[in-house]
């Protein structure tokens, strides 16, 4: 009996290890599709994102991300209202509603919004490579799901509490491993949060980045808007 239990424990360990390997294989293949030369870690580029929303004027954002230089800049223009946030190493500059410019550090609560923007855009436009970041917990099980009639390999990701609390799912084309959909939930309740449908591709510094992102509510498929990437 002891031998059987020991062998069962060994078999269980092998199965779990195999599942984990499969999940990371899918992620590695997805990264191989989007960033075949490993350029993300040294990414330095500028691009424009036009956000189209129902019944609202478009918001045009010009974004600069320089990972080696630890630099981020976001300038937005919506209906003639212009704002900017800039972070360089530990220094932070941003414009207030009245147009005045504040210079401070990233530890200042006033810069919280600027840090949020930096993390937001670096995360979204750095996927799926960002799923290798510390604090990211990749579920070892690869799910097979249908989404809007198409088959996908789905990876579930959670984060250490210090990183984030949302639960994410990433949908990859089973043939090419291109990332085509992702969604997040605010809790185990899958009616919370949003899903994002990706379409088109743009090559930026050797990285294949989804061109358009259409955002919807999970609860009722309500349409929120579409981010459209523009490369000058």
Model-derived regions, located:
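Flexible, processing/modification-adjacent segments and terminal tails
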Residues: 20-26, 94-166, 189-192
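N-terminal mature ectodomain segment of secretory-pathway/periplasmic proteins
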Residues: 31-101, 135-136, 141-143
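Catalytic loop of the DD-peptidase/beta-lactamase superfamily, centered on the K-T-G motif
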Residues: 83-94, 104-111, 223-232
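Gly/Pro-enriched, hydrophobic low-complexity segments
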Residues: 146-232
């Amino acid at each position: 009996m002891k031998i059987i239990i020991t062998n069962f424990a060994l078999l269980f360990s092998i199965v779990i290890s195999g599942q984990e390997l499969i999940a990371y294989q899918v992620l590695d293949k997805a990264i191989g599709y989007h960033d075949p030369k490993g350029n993300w870690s040294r990414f330095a580029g500028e691009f424009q994102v036009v956000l189209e929303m129902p019944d609202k004027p478009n918001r045009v954002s010009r974004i600069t991300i320089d990972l080696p230089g630890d630099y981020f800049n976001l300038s937005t223009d919506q209906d003639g209202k212009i704002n900017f946030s800039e972070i360089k190493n530990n220094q932070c500059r941003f414009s207030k509603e009245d147009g005045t410019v504040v210079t401070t550090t990233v530890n200042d609560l006033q810069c919280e919004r600027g840090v949020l923007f930096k993390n937001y855009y670096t995360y979204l436009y750095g996927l799926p490579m960002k799923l290798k970041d510390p604090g990211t917990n990749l579920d070892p099980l690869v799910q097979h799901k249908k989404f809007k009639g198409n088959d996908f390999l789905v990876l579930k990701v959670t984060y250490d509490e210090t990183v984030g609390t949302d639960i994410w799912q990433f949908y990859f084309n089973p043939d090419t491993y291109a990332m085509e959909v992702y969604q997040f939930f605010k809790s185990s309740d899958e009616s919370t949060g949003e899903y994002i449908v990706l379409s088109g591709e743009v090559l930026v510094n050797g990285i294949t980045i989804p061109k358009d992102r259409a955002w919807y509510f999970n609860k009722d498929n309500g349409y929120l808007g579409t981010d459209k990437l523009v490369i000058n």
